[in-house]
Amino acid sequence: MLIDWFTIVAQIINFLILVFLLNRFLYKPIVKTIKARQQEIENRWQDAEKEKKSAKNEANSYQKKQQELEEKKQEIMIQAQTKADEKYDNLVEEARQDVEQKRKTWDESLEREKAQFFDRFQEKIMQQIYKITGHVLGDLANASLEQQIINQFIHRLENLSEKERENLANSLNTTDNGLIIRSHFEISPESRNRLLSSLQQTHIYQGDNVQFMTNSDLICGIELQASDYKIAWNLKDYVEALEI
């Protein structure tokens, strides 16, 4: 059997040409298309992963912001509650202080009114005692109450302590107004002379600058004043001394 080398070579050449043509016009485009498709898929996959990661980050960020907002909300609520409590406490304290001040003012007003009432009451009682005592003494001893008060005051002057004499002398040295003698009633000229004579005999005051005045507050009483120092005897002081 003879081998036709020409035919074999021609077929080999045709095969190679066919392989080249197939590779050039069929396989390479297909492979290129497949690779391009794979690259596209890979790119889409990577994009999807990126979007997934981004979405996850956004979700985490949103969750974090939500948590921060919740914490801020709680903080604001706590602050608001604290301020509300402080405001309530302040209002309660202001109300308490206002009530306390009003109560104190009311108590002080009540005390003043009570003191004024008792002062007026005592004043009226003293006046009644003054009138009644004057009538009683006048009826029983044939002497007026005024005269008895003068006698009692002269006795008081005659028995001054050394300290009282010293204080009176010091006060007389600090004033040019002399002495002032006040009484609830008008002192008669005769009683005035008795008082002046007593002042000279007891060496309390040798001058003649003595003023006689009336004072309705001296219930059943009489007082001697030199500058800011005074010596007094009256029923009102006597009663107050008994109260103390």
Swiss-Prot record:
It holds the Pfam family ATP-synt_B. One of its GO terms (molecular function) is proton-transporting ATPase activity, rotational mechanism. It is found in: Cellular thylakoid membrane. The chain crosses the membrane at residues 2-22. Keywords: ATP synthesis, CF(0), Hydrogen ion transport, Ion transport, Membrane, Thylakoid, Transmembrane, Transmembrane helix, Transport. InterPro entries: Alt_ATP_synth_F0_bsu, ATP_synth_b/b'su_bac/chlpt, ATP_synthase_B_chain. CDD domains: ATP-synt_Fo_b. It is a single-pass membrane protein. Belongs to the ATPase B chain family. This is ATP synthase subunit b 2. F(1)F(0) ATP synthase produces ATP from ADP in the presence of a proton or sodium gradient. F-type ATPases consist of two structural domains, F(1) containing the extramembraneous catalytic core and F(0) containing the membrane proton channel, linked together by a central stalk and a peripheral stalk. During catalysis, ATP synthesis in the catalytic domain of F(1) is coupled via a rotary mechanism of the central stalk subunits to proton translocation. It comes from the Bacteria. GO terms for cellular component: plasma membrane-derived thylakoid membrane; proton-transporting ATP synthase complex. F-type ATPases have 2 components, F(1) - the catalytic core - and F(0) - the membrane proton channel. F(1) has five subunits: alpha(3), beta(3), gamma(1), delta(1), epsilon(1). F(0) has four main subunits: a(1), b(1), b'(1) and c(10-14). The alpha and beta chains form an alternating ring which encloses part of the gamma chain. F(1) is attached to F(0) by a central stalk formed by the gamma and epsilon chains, while a peripheral stalk is formed by the delta, b and b' chains.
